[in-house]
Amino acid sequence: MRADPSAHQAGKVARAVVGVLVAVAFAVAGCTSPAANPAKPAHQAAHDRSRPNFVFVLTDDLAWNLVSHMPHLLAMQRAGTTMSRYYVVDSLCCPSRSAIFTGQYPHDDGVFTNAGNDGGYFAFNRHGDQQKSFALALHEAGYRTAMMGKYLNQYQPAYPEPPGWDEWDVAGNAYGEFNYNLNQDGRQQHYGKDPRDYLTDVLAAKASAFIDSSAASGRPFMLEVATFAPHAPYTPAPRYANAAQQLAYPKTPAYDRLPANPPPWLARHPYLSAVDQANITTTFRKRVEDDLSVDDMIGELENELRAKGLDRNTYFVFSSDNGFHMGEYTLSSGKQTAFETDIRVPLIVSGPGVPAGRVVSQLTSSIDLAPTFETLAGLPVPASVDGHSLAGLWHGQDPVGWRLAILIEHHGPDYSPDDPDRQTSKPGDPPTYEAVRTPTALYVRYAGGAQEYYDTATDPYELDNLAGKGVPEVLRQALNALETCRGGASCWAAAQLG
């Protein structure tokens, strides 16, 4: 069984990249890199008109410690490739989802939070990000496109459908999985309390129907199914109620421990009480139960693809918008930090030319998905996109001069009263920060001047903050360059630690 690949083993491969000359790296980084022009898999060679399909399942708050409880996803992992060092641009729903759609960092697409002037659906619109979405690019290139489930924070079913989607089945605050409205191609439909109304199951049925109609149309398709699970309040499908009540929470060495020399916001946190720890166990069990219906959906969609003869020409991509801590660093249940628990999430892919059972350890980011979809669809990637296509990595290539740093940007805490990501951790959540992650280090710089620096090669659980002893200048320079980069060439050069 494989779930979360070992960070230590991944680090050995990633560190080997550091010795590559920066000049070679920059030459490869242009839009003509191997990743940008993958060789066509052999079984497609006889079908020059055939373009690949995409099924993209995006979960909400799913952390690596849930993957081992999802048998269909584990089977997909064995049949496909796992990106073991895939990071989100921010451990928060809307900034992460915006980056996935646009391929841009928050400082470039303008979405830093879930609401307010610098976040949410309205900021996404105000910054013209709907026009940057990979969905619009694929739609204009002849793809059938469908968006199902959760779109962006603040979006409600009464709002108009954004451009670029042929089918639109999107809810608003449907975190409870029952009693919600769906905007179904511009018409609102209410779903109630019946077991058949369970949202993840409704999405699974609609997604299967979309695959069926796409097969009949003969057109390539992009299907995104964005579940609300396993976000709180953790409502499992009735068939899975109490299915995980014997599980214990998988504690790591960081559980209920403060790092040495913690930043001020974290140093104020009390250690976990007995009640806190009991709640963490209960929450973990509910999250597992919540995800079992997501896993069922994965199996159903794979079966539908096989039944229609589309499985060999469809990339099936699974991921999460952010990770989730539960007791680590004395924090109860939540996200938003730059710790590994929150920013590193699953990215698992199967499909044409994707090697089975492979683990890719290069640093990858949520800004890379949009250019990957566009590249695999045969489209040019706009120069304004900050990310880089993963097509070469997905096809088993090992590109020379891959990036050596990625950026994480977080604004907060600044909650709207109805923000579903409002956390209960006391006395507070992390303030605004920017961070850089490399194969062997994490450097965090807070707006108030505090810093964190962890040598993750020797301290993988990030328990010894070395910032007081000095931060390597190469990390400071990388963060300075990444936080101001704009566009593919600029952001790729900034990521070379040179």
Language-model segment annotations:
Residues 164-167, 171-175, 322-328, 367-370, ...:
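C-terminal cap/loop subdomain of S1 sulfatases and analogous C-terminal strand-loop tails that border
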Residues 63, 69-70, 82-105, 112-113, ...:
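Short, solvent-exposed turn/loop segments enriched in Gly/Ser/Thr/Pro and often Arg
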Residues 32-34, 49-52, 59, 272-282, ...:
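Long, internal low-complexity/basic segments
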Residues 56-57, 63-146, 167, 173-174, ...:
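Active-site segment of extracytoplasmic enzymes that catalyze sulfate/phosphate-ester chemistry
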Residues 54-55, 60, 138, 150, ...:
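A short aromatic-rich beta-strand->coil structural motif
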Residues 50-55, 79-84, 95, 108, ...:
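Loop/turn elements at helix/coil->beta-strand transitions in domains of secreted/extracellular proteins
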Residues 26-47:
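C-terminal region of N-terminal signal peptides and the immediate post-cleavage residues
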Residues 46-49, 65, 91, 172-198, ...:
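Active-site-proximal cap/lid insertion segments
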